[in-house]
Amino acid sequence: MQYPTIKASQDASDNLGMSTKVTIAEFNEAITDEFCAKYSQDGRKLLKVPYELNGTYSIKEGVRIICDEAFLDLCSLRSLVIPDSVTSIGERAFMCCKSLESLVIPDSVTSIGDSAFMGCGSLRSLVIPDSVTSIGGGAFSGCKSLESLVIPDSVTSIGGGAFRGCYSLTNIVIPNSITSIGARAFEGCEFLTNIAIPDGVTSVGEYAFWGCNSLTNIAIPDGITSIEKRTFLDCKSLSSVVILEGVTSIGDDAFMGCESLNSVIIPDSVTSIGRGAFWGCWSLNSLVIPDSVTSIGDDALRGCTSLTDIVIPDDVTSIGNRAFRGCTSLSSLVIPDSVTSIGESAFGGCNFPNDIEQELISRFGEKIFG
């Protein structure tokens, strides 16, 4: 059967009410092309492509929607031509197309669904057009060969896990239009050396840069009020962090395992330092905790073996369990009268002079050195 040519309407309102999901009725009434790919009766939706398809495939002119899972697990598909009539790429549309090497997304596309290209391990480069406004969660997760990517100014949000596990990605430019970066967005991008978070970003999700081992420096803009837990966990090459005014809390394990971190500026706006926030930051030799901080969480600076001195401000009331445990170079410390609670083993393994140690024991008991 010859597939009829569909003339794409120029009226964007034609897409109103169209879904990337496939109904039973649509599937049963589908038109089949010469490759056994199924299209909706009106030719505006590509429903499903057979697993046997290999090599190169050209989507028919006039298609508006590439439906959810349309190309799922097509392991032999190498290249694809998407016509400029397409406006939406559905969820998991090309998931696990492991041989897909090249792809051009036309200017007509406005949205890329969740996990759309997840696991496309052979995809090396990609240009996202200016028409796209959102990149779904996990959209390019596991694209381990993707080396470069340009995100256009039209995009306002990067979904959770969008580029998770893109091991070959070395550089990415986040445009000023971005306001949010989802959880795990760049997790495991081991060779990403440089990334700038634009001033317009107001939220960065948990684990967003976990394991970005080549990232050397980062600046947190003042629009962000909270550094979420494990945002920079195990960024082993991260040596410098600038946190601008506006951030009020540093979350649990936020910089844990950042073993090259030697400089961090905490602004006066921060009121709490979470559990394990700087645990294992071996190179951190000094830290100024601002007067605004009222609590230091469990394990907050545990294992910071290069830390030689620290000033705890007058408004701190509690220091958590093991907060400074294993800070073997810490030789001087002043704890203000405002502190009423120090957790167990808070200073275990610290080599204080005897007079300082005895003074602390008299105030808080031997448990703090246990």
Task: Walk through the language-model features, giving the residues of each.
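Structural signature of tandem-repeat unit edges
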Residues: 1-38, 44, 49-65, 74-88, ...
